[in-house]
């Protein structure tokens, strides 16, 4: 009889992740797992709790100990090219400072699949235009990226992420430059991308109310460690309230029904 092998764990697993700047540990032994793909994971915590550091470490941009696994594959073991095909990282600032059209920015998402000096194919160009249409920027495809508004730039970078088609998305406050309407659009697009595409997204969010409303799972950081892992759809409001209040200070969560009949939680600081 052949020995049975244990299948690799599905989803995202962060194991004992530690990041140091000099002698100071910014993250210390961070561990959590989300064993089901297709989840939008909100990363919460006050300024300085290590949210951005965690994203950068998972993206392979910071030296660290511990490891991150996606569907059983250790990200730290991947080549630079393979890691770029597996992980799509979106920082708070795009870093783009040269004149490129919005379409050209989206086409950058295909770079990990192209050889040296290889140009995007016609199919890639069509996919880039479709991604821009999805985020509502079809009419901006030929416009210089640098002339777009802050919110349009964020949506353009999201279109690049759609084109990239990586299984793991790491996004650092993608809503930071968006108005109320576009924040809702951004989170709805992210949820659709994750849920229909079977992807896993770890999203750093500044606003716990937005995270409660849009995320499937919340990982709350405090002092460089994991304070709580929460499930907004199933955890009792009292559990969510206590965990968030321990990090953000006094607050109250009130179950409400919106005008469309959806049950939601309103967050009120006290």
Residue ranges and their predicted role:
Residues 59:
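Helix-to-loop junction immediately C-terminal to a conserved catalytic motif
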Residues 237-270:
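ABC ATPase nucleotide-binding domains
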Residues 169-173:
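Catalytic Walker B motif of ABC-type/P-loop ATPase nucleotide-binding domains
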Residues 44-46:
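The feature captures the beta-strand-to-loop junction immediately N-terminal to the Walker
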Residues 144-148, 152:
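Conserved ABC ATPase signature
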Residues 66-74, 83:
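Conserved ABC transporter NBD signature motif
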Residues 107, 122-140:
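Conserved ABC ATPase "signature" region
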